[in-house]
Amino acid sequence: MRIILLNLLFIAVTLPCFAQNLQGWLIYFGNTKIKESKFSIHQEIQLRDYKIVGDHHQTLVRVGAQYQLKPYLVTTLGYGFIYTESFGEPNNPFVEHRIYQEALFNHSMGKAKFRHRLRLEERFIQNQEFRGRFRYCLFADIPLTDKGFAKHGAYIAVYDELFLNIADDANITVFDRNRAYAGIGYKFRDNLGVQLGYMFQNVGVQQGTNNVLLSFHHNLKIK
């Protein structure tokens, strides 16, 4: 617990130094396992602001049907709804409907856990041509306490995700963006945890963004 408090104190002290450039994301990740089967449901909602709190940027809702092919491999077929507003006025809102397919591989190395996520997206964006996108993300979770990833355990969470566009349009570059994240997590229960972290998003020719992420991670089971 002392390690957690020290890390949270460090984040609280350093964030004001560049708070004017920070964006805020509030996220809920849920996974509902269906009885003793290999099927589960992924549910997710994200609220993204141009400021840490306030000036809405984007709302994302995602749901997916998952199937565990192997102990180390989960596949997903899902749908996402994304509502986006521009910075300032006018906010020029637009909607995106997104279908995605995903494969998630996991393995351990010592006490650390690693996940490799491959995702293919079909994007239907309002007033734009259809385009696809490929994403690869490497996650690593490293325990900080003897409890590991169980109740009252704390851990470091890092990931890096690359986005590549798939489009028949010379004006759309192949590189879309890259996200690098580092944070600290804590498990309130075996099936409920929270993470607080920082993410830098490189969006190519546009100015990169600094983001503070507060995320809740919840596993449920239908008996």
Language model feature labels by segment:
Residues 34, 45-51, 79-85, 107-111, ...:
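Transmembrane beta-strands of outer-membrane beta-barrel pores
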Residues 39-43, 75-77, 114-118, 136, ...:
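Transmembrane beta-strands of outer-membrane beta-barrel proteins
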Residues 20-78, 85:
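Start-of-domain marker
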Residues 103, 209-223:
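Outer-membrane beta-barrel "beta-signal"
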Residues 32-34, 67, 105-107, 142-144, ...:
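Residue-level signature of outer-membrane beta-barrel architecture
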Residues 1-24, 220-222:
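Bacterial Sec-dependent N-terminal signal peptides
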Residues 34-38, 72, 108-113, 144-154, ...:
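Short loop/turn motifs that connect adjacent beta-strands in outer-membrane beta-barrel proteins
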